[in-house]
């Protein structure tokens, strides 16, 4: 389970993420949906321990990602937007390397390697050089490295971006298969991705959560696209109105 509470990240006067809270339950796939620049990647980096927050807490199966970082990060498999591959390494050598970094016991490395190669459809690619793989297969290797230590939590940042339609279909199917008893957070700006494979959606706009709901509880006859557009339009309207009020107050103070 992932519990995010009142997460805020600022850079000087710029607020990238403000008071973000949501929960991803065990065995579920949560779609973290928002337009480009909404704060999705910043949030993903914070909840995986790769970036500090300005304020707020993140619990990974009850462990604080900030104060119990090593223990919490062992429970996470993370696929960033660009898979962290070494292009000169062969697939199996790279995955063995990651397994050692992740603390997989020596006696369990080969079984773990065999498992992720099979699950991710890479059995025939084990001896291939990472840099010579298609983008779809590089993404599969990225998923394999996130799974090599058998984590209970998977965080995937834009896992299908830049793929062709066939590759997108294959990766979505793979993600759905991998979920099982894991908690999966899938960051994306692609509406069909959420509607096809997710159980729950969190919509973020301008660094704020504007909706958190299970897909099956969305109003009947209303599409996710309608809800998404309505939510981000409302947020931006309220943000604009708030800015206007602030300017009026400042102006009144100078009269």
Predicted regions and their residues:
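Helical segment within the ABC ATPase nucleotide-binding domain
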Residues: 168-180
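Conserved ABC ATPase signature
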Residues: 129-133
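A short, surface-exposed alpha-helical micro-motif characterized by mixed small hydrophobic
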Residues: 194-196
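ABC ATPase "signature
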Residues: 212-213
């Amino acid at each position: 389970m992932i519990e995010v509470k009142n997460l805020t990240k600022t850079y000087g006067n710029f607020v990238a993420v403000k008071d973000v809270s949501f929960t991803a339950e065990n065995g579920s796939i949560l779609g973290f949906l928002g337009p480009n620049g909404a704060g999705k990647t910043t949030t993903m980096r914070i909840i995986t321990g790769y970036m500090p927050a300005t304020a707020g807490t993140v619990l990974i199966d009850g462990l604080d990602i900030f104060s119990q970082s090593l223990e919490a990060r062992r429970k996470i498999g993370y696929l960033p937007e660009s898979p962290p591959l070494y292009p000169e390494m062969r697939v199996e050598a790279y995955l063995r390397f990651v397994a050692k970094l992740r603390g997989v016991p020596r006696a369990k490395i080969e079984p773990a390697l065999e498992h992720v190669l099979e699950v991710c459809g890479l059995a025939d690619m084990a001896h291939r050089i990472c840099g010579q793989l298609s983008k779809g297969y590089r993404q599969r290797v990225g998923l394999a490295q996130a799974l090599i230590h058998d984590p209970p939590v998977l965080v995937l940042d834009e896992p299908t971006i830049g793929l062709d339609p066939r590759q997108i279909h294959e990766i979505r199917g793979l993600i759905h298969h991998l979920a099982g008893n894991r908690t999966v957070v899938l960051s994306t700006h692609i509406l069909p991705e959420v509607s096809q494979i997710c159980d729950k959606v969190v919509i973020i706009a301008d660094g704020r959560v504007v909706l958190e709901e299970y897909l099956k509880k969305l109003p009947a006859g209303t599409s996710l696209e309608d809800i998404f557009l309505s939510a981000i339009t409302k947020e931006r309207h309220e943000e604009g109105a708030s800015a206007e009020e602030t300017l009026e107050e400042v102006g009144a103070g100078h009269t």
